């Protein structure tokens, strides 16, 4: 299969998929396909996995197939994206071109939870240094997920099309189903999407289970689009409905997550200028507790429920027009968010803690970017100025007893008298360069300066708790009103090489981060006393430290015959503090994924090896445990019975190996065959079957 290097406008790695992972058949076009594609700056060399029957429930798990990317898993549908060792708020994620909103203080509704795999059209990861136009804060990279709402037709005649998908996973007795339908012509497009995922606890082997890994999620979406020769508009609204879902790495489980979204994307061409923009609103209600889906605390006074809510309004407007053998883009964007969370005890009506009280974080940005050719170089360069405004209402606690009440009141008073209103203003810069060295090799380079202001948890967590955006290290944290923004300076260097049947896309990077925010031992005696009463350990405090990260990743492949090929990706990252002799927390170990793929006519077979090295470079401050290396084998296959009907299936972890994923958290659910405090074990053998019908 021939792979051509072709011109592109951004440095991205793209994962394309629709209702069900299926092969791209060599002789026939099919509406279902999965690609993992690595792009370097301006020249694209694909890393295609065709097919890739990936029976994932959590979209974030797809990132393991992108060079440099991975996932921090806190539950069956609570994966937090990681890219080159950074994760959480440092990695920007957009859904349908709009910034995402995480409603809970522990990221139980992580951004990619809102895009079930069976409804996903594409997941795009900017490789290396993200353009300044891509996102407001992209210190750790940028990703864009797009739901599959269909395409406009080619005539005035209306056409009705769609897909019905169903999948069964043996390991958790899980099932996933999805319905996509579109009524369209060349000017109008009406789309409706529905999906449902449900499963029981994950089995490790024939005898053991991981307690608290059950899940149930529904997703609904309706959209309307209109276009003519020069303009396009799409309006959409959707809902996420998650119920009774476990998060064994966290102190509570999900009772429900009700997420509502509405938005619009517009573009129009005026002469040589293209104007585009988006407007979106999201609202999330989220209830979690520590007693309904795991062993309840021995004391009725230790029951806890946390009712969180959040909303955001986001917008962008940009103009793009030809200039100096390229294109100039100028734009502005904003994202205003508010978070509230209240902790209660169902056995004590007097107990109430204002975990967060209208914690505001508003980001406003302006940017300019030019992309074009200078001699043999293709250049993309830009600058962005962001202003982040943060504030919070007063907090407090009631219903506590004795010393605990006194300490909590002291912390609340100190917080309320602190400087809650804070502004951060900073400059981001990005430069990506690319040029061909010869017919087979393209050189890619990048330079960047990126910033990130503190999250609302990092500033406004006034009581020592584990509400940390999903860190899942088992420690209590306290916020810090004196935090500075993080500033990263990064350089990347790589090349794309293709010679006949072989291809490879290596890239190395070095990132120096000043004022990196992480937990350090708290010097607040009141917070430490209260944390020790609650957990037996003193608190960690968010603080600025200095860090560095470096590593390499690549995709590679080799075509053996017309029907047989090898494809894989390799990733390595190292994270260290520069001011102390310590390593950074929860960094993915060296890993490699290699697949042998047979594909002919309507048949596909795949044999995949997944290898992870041991991780002994761990964080002392987080008391992070080392993990051993492991390897598993996966099998996959599919058969297209007709042009409309495809069957697929496979076996994950064929030999039922027992292993620990270093990016999984530590178990906090006593209803499990894994001891409390031990790192969660990876899933055992999983047999899955699936079918998709198109019309």
Describe the role of every protein-language-model region.
Residues 199-201, 205-207, 211-217, 230-275, ...:
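Flexible loop and strand-edge segments within Gram-negative outer membrane beta-barrel domains
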Residues 452, 514, 613-617, 638-695:
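C-terminal beta-signal and adjacent terminal beta-strands/loops
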Residues 99-128:
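Short acidic/polar hinge/loop motifs at secondary-structure boundaries
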Residues 144, 149-152, 158-162, 172, ...:
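Periplasmic-side early beta-strands and strand-to-turn transitions of outer-membrane beta-barrels
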């Amino acid at each position: 299969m021939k792979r051509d290097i072709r011109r592109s406008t951004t440095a991205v790695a793209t994962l394309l998929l629709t209702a069900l992972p299926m092969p791209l058949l060599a002789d026939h076009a099919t509406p279902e396909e999965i690609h993992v594609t690595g792009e370097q700056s301006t020249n694209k060399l694909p890393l295609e996995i065709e097919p890739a029957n990936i029976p994932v429930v959590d979209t974030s798990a797809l990132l393991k197939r992108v060079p440099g990317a991975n996932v921090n898993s806190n539950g069956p549908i609570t994966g937090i994206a990681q890219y080159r060792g950074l994760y959480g708020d440092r990695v920007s994620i957009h859904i349908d071109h709009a910034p995402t909103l995480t409603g809970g203080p522990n990221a139980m509704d992580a951004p990619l939870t809102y895009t079930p795999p069976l409804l996903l059209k594409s997941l795009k990861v900017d490789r290396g240094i993200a353009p300044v136009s891509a996102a407001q804060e992209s210190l750790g990279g940028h990703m864009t997920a797009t739901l599959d709402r269909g395409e406009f037709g080619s005539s005035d005649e209306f056409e009705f099309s769609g897909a019905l998908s169903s999948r069964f996973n043996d390991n958790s007795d899980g099932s996933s189903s999805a319905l996509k339908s579109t009524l369209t012509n060349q000017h109008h497009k009406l789309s409706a999407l529905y999906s449902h995922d449900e499963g029981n606890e994950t089995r490790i082997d024939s005898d053991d289970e991981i307690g608290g890994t059950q899940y149930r999620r529904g997703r609904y979406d309706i959209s309307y689009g209109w276009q003519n020769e020069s303009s396009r508009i799409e309006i959409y609204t959707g809902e996420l409905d998650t119920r009774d879902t476990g998060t064994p790495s966290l102190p509570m489980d999900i009772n429900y997550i009700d997420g509502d979204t509405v938005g619009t994307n517009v573009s129009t061409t005026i002469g040589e200028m293209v104007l585009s923009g988006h407007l979106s609103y999201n609202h999330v209600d989220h209830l979690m507790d520590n007693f309904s889906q795991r062993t309840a605390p021995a004391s009725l006074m230790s029951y806890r429920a946390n009712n969180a809510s959040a909303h955001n309004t986001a917008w962008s407007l940009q103009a793009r027009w030809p200039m100096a053998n390229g294109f100039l883009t100028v734009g502005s964007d904003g994202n205003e968010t508010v978070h509230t969370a209240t902790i209660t005890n169902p056995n004590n009506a007097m107990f109430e803690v204002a975990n967060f009280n209208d914690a505001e974080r508003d980001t406003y940005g302006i940017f300019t970017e030019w992309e074009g050719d200078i001699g043999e170089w293709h250049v993309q360069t830009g600058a962005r100025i962001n202003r982040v405004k943060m504030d919070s209402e007063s907090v407090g606690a009631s219903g506590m007893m004795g010393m605990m009440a006194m300490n909590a009141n002291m912390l609340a008073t100190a917080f309320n008298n602190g400087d809650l209103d804070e502004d951060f203003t900073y400059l981001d810069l990005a430069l990506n360069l690319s040029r061909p060295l010869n017919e087979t090799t393209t050189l890619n380079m990048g330079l960047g300066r990126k910033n990130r202001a503190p999250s609302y948890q990092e500033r406004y967590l006034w009581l020592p708790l584990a509400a940390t955006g999903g860190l899942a290290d088992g420690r209590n944290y306290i916020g810090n009103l004196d935090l500075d923004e993080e500033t990263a300076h990064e350089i990347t260097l790589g090349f794309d090489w293709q010679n006949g049947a072989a291809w490879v896309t290596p890239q190395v990077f070095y990132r120096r981060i000043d004022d990196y925010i992480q937990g350090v031992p708290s010097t607040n005696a009141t917070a430490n006393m209260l944390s020790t009463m609650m957990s037996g350990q003193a608190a960690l405090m968010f603080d600025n430290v200095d860090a560095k990260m470096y590593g390499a990743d690549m995709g590679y492949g080799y075509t053996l015959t017309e029907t047989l090929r090898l494809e894989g990706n390799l990733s390595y990252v190292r994270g260290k503090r520069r001011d102390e002799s310590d390593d950074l927390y929860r960094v993915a170990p060296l890993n490699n994924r290699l697949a042998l793929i047979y594909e002919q006519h309507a048949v596909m077979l795949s044999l995949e090896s997944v290898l992870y090295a041991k991780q002994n470079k761990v964080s002392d401050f987080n008391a992070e445990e080392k993990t051993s290396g492991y390897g598993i084998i996966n099998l996959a296959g599919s058969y297209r019975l007709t042009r409309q009907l495809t069957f697929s299936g496979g076996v994950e972890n064929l030999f039922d190996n027992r292993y620990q994923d270093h990016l999984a958290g530590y178990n906090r659910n006593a209803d499990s065959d894994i001891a409390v405090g031990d790192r969660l074990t990876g899933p055992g053998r999983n047999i899955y079957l699936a079918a998709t019908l198109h019309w």
